[in-house]
Amino acid sequence: MKMDAYNAVGIAEGFVEAESEEQVIEAWQYLHDTGLGYQLQGFFGRTLQRLIEGGYVHA
C-alpha cells in the first residue's frame, strides 16, 4: 500500500488495516514527517510523542 495522508490516518485510527506492524510504524512516521499528526486531534500528537520517546518514530 502506498503511504499517503488517507492511509496513514486510517491506519492510526484503525479504519484501514495495516499489512504489518512495520506498516503501522511507517504510517506514524509519515504523520510525523509531514507534520499532519500535529495538526489533527490531540490523540495523534500525544501518540507520536510516546512513539518518539520509545524509539519507534525518528524525530
Which ranges hold each PLM region?
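Catalytic phosphate/metal-binding cores of nucleic-acid and nucleotide-processing enzymes, i.e., regions
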Residues: 1-59
